[in-house]
Amino acid sequence: MKYLYKLFPALMLGLLFTSCDSEELHDLNINPQAVNEMNLNFIFTTAELGIAANGSSGDNRYTDWRTNIGMCAHAIQHLANAGGGIAPGDKYTENFETNAAPFEFTYNDQLKNIAEILKQTADGGYDAGNKANMRNASRILRAFSFQRLVDFYGNVPYFNANRGLDGSEYFFPEYDESSAIYKDLLKELDEASAAMSASLPDEGFAAADIIFNGDVAKWKKWGYSLMLRMAMRASDVDAALANTYVQKAIAGGVMTSNADNAIVPMALGPSEWTNQNGISRAFFPGDGGQPTFLSKTLIDYLKGADHATVADDDPRLMVISGGIADWTAAAWTPINTNPLDQKGMPNGKDQQDLDAIEGTAVDQAKTYSRINYLMLQDDDPYMIMNYAEVELLLAEAAERGIGGASNAKSHFEAGVRAACQMYNIYDASLKVDNAAVDAYLAANPYGTAKPALQMIGEQLWVSKFLNWWEAWSDWRRIGYPVLVPTNHPSGLTGGKIPTRLKYPTSEVAGNPSYKSGSTQPDDYTTRVWWDTK
């Protein structure tokens, strides 16, 4: 230490009597080891993993476990929970991590990475004029991510979001109106989808793109399909906007088969924290261990109007349900796989409530149907958006006379068929043949068994199994299926199903802009801008 004391005065004298110009002083502040050029291919792949809640920000289970599963799957009554795990959507309780996870991970993960790609491919960036397809694919990913944020929270920072990365030191972005964000996102989808072209140089895009492997035609279909989703989501509050963009989506070309589904592949390696399916990890015994019991609402729907026969059963019953079974880290042990005996757990109940309903001490594992474990392997793919949704939205648009869509019955039947036949990506044994779908459609004729819009809403709801975030949004907008709310003593909503997430406490306390532009009141029953049902 004494040498430092002696050296310091000498250094100070040297600085005082040394002539330095401003440029030399400026250079002293530049870190010669700082990274100022990055391989955008790696960043793009990370952004794609991020939309599957599997990006670079930490636990790949975190957002799925707390929000997709804990809130959404239970609130829309696909799953039920009578103790254990994370399930604020079952009894309408509060979990601060459930509220925070999508906000924090979306901004800090995929949107951060996408912002870097857009910055470096814009004028002045080191890849300016290059990677045009990657740039426009990133705009589509960005629209997907912001749509989800708006649908969860309402108003969010958008136009000035993620600008802390561009050197502007813009650390407290304003909140923007949801309607303005939606309009800009639709414009972005329109421009980005149209601009993608197979004739442009690849420059590593195909290798970086793990969703479509650089297939520009599929990217364009996904962009226009997202446009259709967002336009229909705005249809009750801005008819002109919906009409314009449904028409553009149809003209641009939406998904036409399950081969167009947007799917992020997963893998077992290099570790459980990297590349594995976060939904599966949340449920897998010995890892997440979240209970996997299916809701009575869902099982009753899949068993058809007559529970005493399989004649009108939905062919997805024993695809979504693996049966009544015991699942441990060591083995999946079926107890009862008879379709007639499948039984869902009622939502909003505790163990003592189940005992009272059943008239005996209930062993949950031996009583209630579980999610099929074949859909919950750690390397199972993660489906982001499916073709079935597109056909069902086109059926709704045709039924309501929006955007020039026509032939609602054909679109509905194509949507149901696609929804029944998309699960073989998890395991070949989950394939549903055409005969089974034909029988189901014949037993449930479009617009006859129930009103057409109700049938469309119910099919959208069941088609989003595992993609519970979007099922929650569909239910909030359409109002089908008719769900009976729970009213548990610990609930915070007065017996109302939650209709939005609350902002993270860190955002409330840390961003001064929250006070002037956020959606208020900041509670679970405030409706986002498109929710009129």
Predicted features, each with a name:
Residues 1-29:
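Bacterial Sec-dependent N-terminal signal peptides
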Residues 20-72, 108, 116, 122-125, ...:
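Membrane-proximal, proline-rich intrinsically disordered regions
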Residues 34-41, 80-141, 145-423, 427, ...:
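Structured, solvent-exposed acidic/aromatic patches
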Residues 54-57, 62, 73-79, 83-86, ...:
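Glycan-recognition patch characteristic of GH18 chitinases/ENGases
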Residues 71-72, 137, 204-218, 338-348, ...:
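Amphipathic alpha-helical surface "interface" segments used
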Residues 420-533:
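C-terminal functional modules
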